[in-house]
Amino acid sequence: MDINRQKRYRRRRRRNDKGLICLLVFFAAAALVILNFCMKSPTSDDPDNTPGQNTVDRPVVEPNVPGNSNGSINADDWHLVLVNRWHALPEDWQPNLVPLDDGWEIDSRCYDSLVTMLDDCRSSGANPLICSAYRSQETQENLFSNQVSAFLAQGYSTGESEKLAANQIAIPGTSEHQLGLAVDIVDIDYQQLDEAQKHTPTQLWLAENSWRYGFILRYPNDKTELTGIVYEPWHYRYVGEEYAKDIYEKGVCLEEYLSGN
């Protein structure tokens, strides 16, 4: 092989090597993008929460809040029943439902407190609107199934779709809405389920006063690792006036309160 042919051969080989390196870099970058997408999980208990608005990593293991270790409270009190991704709805739970406006239902034990709270909120000049309350097992199953179908339509496998769906819709049996003691309230002039909701007149009033009526903000901004749910400034849970006052004054979530922290 003469010198010129050797030079041409080396140049072609360098070009081929560079092309191979670029190809490997491309596939590595693509793999990282896919992995990053799958690891991100906008955890919300509300199906109308737009994916990506609140993005956090879901807890992989149950947080260190054992449930009911606080000796000062009654672990069997229905006010404090814990339902989250680690504690499913009790099998014998049967809410006594009564109708609300717009077709929603709620447990009769918190009906009067809810109506009074909303009336007083309106008297302050705000315009609260209930956008979700009790959900049956069937309703929750349909919501979850629809979310799975949405991911299947995007090309994910069944297993991947179910995992991704669980990051956005509570698995049936683990949604607090199935208790009948939880309600989602928005401002009639701003009905988006995002963090901007907290700045509305309705949420400003509820954040300061809901505890007076036995309701707590169930998913505070800084408690996601404990609740398993991202910040939801619209989601309120009835626990009774005594417990609500105590939880509000301590600045804890329900999981912390039950653990005695």
Outline where the language-model segments fall:
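Extracytoplasmic cell-surface/polysaccharide-interacting catalytic and binding patches
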Residues: 2-261
